[in-house]
């Protein structure tokens, strides 16, 4: 599964929303993810995408849209 689809699947599971046509929507400002869902998202990304993003190094502005999450996951994969 490619990164984009994996991220969209995870976000769909957590928010109940199909965000594929809202790739630049701020998921925090729109109330789609709260702090608990954010931790769950990071755990799911670790499990499904093989990347580790510690909560202590999580900066919301770097992860606030589906496109930014995809870019961050791809960046972490390339480290």
UniProtKB/Swiss-Prot annotation:
Pfam families assigned: PP-binding (PF00550)
Domain of life: Bacteria
One GO term (biological process): lipoteichoic acid biosynthetic process
Presence of keyword Coiled coil: no
Pathway: Cell wall biogenesis; lipoteichoic acid biosynthesis
TM region positions: none
Signal peptide: none
Residue numbers of O-(pantetheine 4'-phosphoryl)serine PTMs: 35
Matches recorded under InterPro entries: ACP-like_sf, DltC, PP-bd_ACP
Post-translational modification: 4'-phosphopantetheine is transferred from CoA to a specific serine of apo-DCP.
GO CC annotation terms, alphabetical: cytoplasm
GO function terms (MF aspect): D-alanyl carrier activity
Protein keywords: Cell wall biogenesis/degradation, Cytoplasm, Phosphopantetheine, Phosphoprotein
UniProt-annotated location(s): Cytoplasm
Family, per entry: Belongs to the DltC family.
Biological role stated in the UniProt entry: Carrier protein involved in the D-alanylation of lipoteichoic acid (LTA). The loading of thioester-linked D-alanine onto DltC is catalyzed by D-alanine--D-alanyl carrier protein ligase DltA. The DltC-carried D-alanyl group is further transferred to cell membrane phosphatidylglycerol (PG) by forming an ester bond, probably catalyzed by DltD. D-alanylation of LTA plays an important role in modulating the properties of the cell wall in Gram-positive bacteria, influencing the net charge of the cell wall.
Name this polypeptide is given: D-alanyl carrier protein
Organism: Lactobacillus gasseri (strain ATCC 33323 / DSM 20243 / BCRC 14619 / CIP 102991 / JCM 1131 / KCTC 3163 / NCIMB 11718 / NCTC 13722 / AM63)
